[in-house]
């Protein structure tokens, strides 16, 4: 069984950004603006939901 506390430690899941897409000027759908981004070093995009993060990953591929 997976320990859910461990999953929150994974940056990509915490930011709803499984592709660990770096911060950019791209206007991704569902992107959280830099002022509201809670990533500690603000180097990675953050999305409203995992679905938006997966969408960005697929479009970025």
Annotate each PLM feature.
Residues 1-61:
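Cell-wall polysaccharide-cleaving catalytic domain and substrate-binding groove, primarily
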